[in-house]
């Protein structure tokens, strides 16, 4: 099991954008299971007119960070200004099964479908208390040198 310190050594995300709290299982090059505890104190809930549902974009970003953790597990890059940076190049077959609300702990399951050169295809789902809340049929990520993106 890996906590925040270990996660920070692998990917460049930091508060308030780091949306993974713990890695509970990992099979490098194959699959990962991560946890994200949703709190009512997160910046997305600062507006009093916001409802209880955790924003879908943040839920998907949390899943995507889990995907980056899997692909970077054996080749960490905690500095987004150097080395290669992961970019989302496509997401398909997304199905939302229900809301996530403060107090929920989201369990992201990500599996590597294929990896070639500077690209990876992943798929998976997210659970809350054993209930599926999100499915991602295909998530494609590309890696580019940070210097090329400046």
Can you say where each PLM-predicted feature lies in the sequence?
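Hydrophobic beta-strand-centered segment that forms part of the acyl-chain substrate-binding groove
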Residues: 1, 68-107, 136
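Short aromatic-glycine motifs in intrinsically disordered, low-complexity regions
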Residues: 2-14
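HotDog/MaoC-like acyl-thioester-processing domains
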Residues: 72, 100-150
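Conserved positions in beta-strands of structured domains
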Residues: 21-24, 92, 97, 111-113, ...
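Compact, glycine-rich, soluble single-domain proteins
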Residues: 47-70, 88
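Short coil-to-beta-strand transition motifs
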Residues: 12-19, 102-107
């Amino acid at each position: 099991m890996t906590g925040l310190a270990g996660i920070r050594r692998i990917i460049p995300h930091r508060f308030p954008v780091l949306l993974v709290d713990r890695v509970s299982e990992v099979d490098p090059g194959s699959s990962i299971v991560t946890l994200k505890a949703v709190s009512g104190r997160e910046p997305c809930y600062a507006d009093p007119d916001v409802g209880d549902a955790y924003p879908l974009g943040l839920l998907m970003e949390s899943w995507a960070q889990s995907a980056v953790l899997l692909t970077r597990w054996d080749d960490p890059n905690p500095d987004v200004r150097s080395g290669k940076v992961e970019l989302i190049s496509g997401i398909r077959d997304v199905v939302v099964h229900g809301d996530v609300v403060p107090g929920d702990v989201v369990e992201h399951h990500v599996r590597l479908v294929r990896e070639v050169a500077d690209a990876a295809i992943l798929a998976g789902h997210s659970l809350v208390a054993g209930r599926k809340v999100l499915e991602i049929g295909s998530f494609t990520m590309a890696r580019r040198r940070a210097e090329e993106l400046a």
